[in-house]
């Protein structure tokens, strides 16, 4: 009888152990990566590679940052950049957007293709070799010409960066815009994207 009781006790203990080990291990959900903020040149390098996959002769005609709830353009960086490219061979233009935000659109996203016209001044392509000055350096220059004073008074003012070619002056320009967009702004400073020199306060 004693042996029977001991055998039954052993079986109960074994069942308890097996039930403990049978419990599925709790798997921790991977934490989303924090938002990534980069300068214009850093984003452009990624976007240029993507554009060359579309057309081997693709050249940029505009690079611009995007203002979002999490990205206000401080320190010359943004969480979203869009570069537009033209291809004379394919007679097309196409935009690519890089996003470092915590969303499903994170990474590089291509836009739709449109028709390219060499005579269109708004799609004037330029050689990437002219881009020697980054957006954070352009901001430093703009800060010395009114930006620092403006942000001291209104620190919540977003800063937007637009890079394009000026056909009249034949130079690549960073437009550092203190405001919501190219038309709605409090200050707009033009900086040479090859030398970093101050050009003018734009009207």
List where the protein language model places each region.
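Sec-dependent bacterial lipoprotein signal peptides
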Residues: 1-15
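Long, terminal "pre-/pro-" and other extracytoplasmic accessory regions
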Residues: 5, 17-203
């Amino acid at each position: 009888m004693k042996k029977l009781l001991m055998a039954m006790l052993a079986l109960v203990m074994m069942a308890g152990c097996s039930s403990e080990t049978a419990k599925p291990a709790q798997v921790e959900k991977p934490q989303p990566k924090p938002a990534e903020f980069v300068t214009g040149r850093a984003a452009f390098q990624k976007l240029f590679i993507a554009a060359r996959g579309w057309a081997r002769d693709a050249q940029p005609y505009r690079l611009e940052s995007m203002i979002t709830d999490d990205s206000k353009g401080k320190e010359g960086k943004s969480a979203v950049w869009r570069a537009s490219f033209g291809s004379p061979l394919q007679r097309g233009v196409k935009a690519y957007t890089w996003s470092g935000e915590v969303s499903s659109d994170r990474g590089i996203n291509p836009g739709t293709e449109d028709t390219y016209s060499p005579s269109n001044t708004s799609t004037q392509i330029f050689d990437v070799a002219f881009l020697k000055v980054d957006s954070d350096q352009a901001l430093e220059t703009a800060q010395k010409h009114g930006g620092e004073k403006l942000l001291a008074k209104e620190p919540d003012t977003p800063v937007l960066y637009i890079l394009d070619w000026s056909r009249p002056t034949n130079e690549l320009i960073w437009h550092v815009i203190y405001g919501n967009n190219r038309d709605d702004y409090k200050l707009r400073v033009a900086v040479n994207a090859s030398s970093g020199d101050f050009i003018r306060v734009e009207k």
